[in-house]
């Protein structure tokens, strides 16, 4: 998951198009052979249209109820403006929020409550350092 924060506008959240239609932090699953950083860049672009640089790891959430682990990374977009949404299949809306909406995902609620303040100048990590072994 990506924590993308604009000092004036708040934190970037995406609203799911289907299911419970919850507000969530951008992110998704890592494909086999894909690094964490590449997966997050791909997911953020697919969901928001933004290109981002990935910074430091901010938090970890063990989702044992879903057999998953959520990792939260700082991310800095190449542009503050959000591109159009005509090609997004899974996401209905993308917008910055100063407070957490009522219909937020469990992961968004957890990371929002655990935040310590705005993320500034987070160091980047190499994309090649976190890869699955070849199958």
Predicted regions and their residues:
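Active-site-adjacent beta-strand/loop module that shapes the phosphate/pyrophosphate-binding cleft
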Residues: 61-84, 95-96, 100, 110, ...
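Nudix hydrolase/Nudix homology domain
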Residues: 20-23, 89-135
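Conserved N-terminal beta-strand and adjoining loop/helix that marks the start
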Residues: 1-11, 29
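Conserved positions in beta-strands of structured domains
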Residues: 5, 55-59, 78
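The catalytic Nudix box helix
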Residues: 25-57, 73
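Short, acidic/hydrophobic/Gly-rich beta-strand patch recurrent on exposed beta strands
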Residues: 13-16, 74
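Short strand-connecting beta-turns/loops that link adjacent beta-strands
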Residues: 7-9, 18-19, 65-66
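Vicinal oxygen chelate
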Residues: 55, 83-91
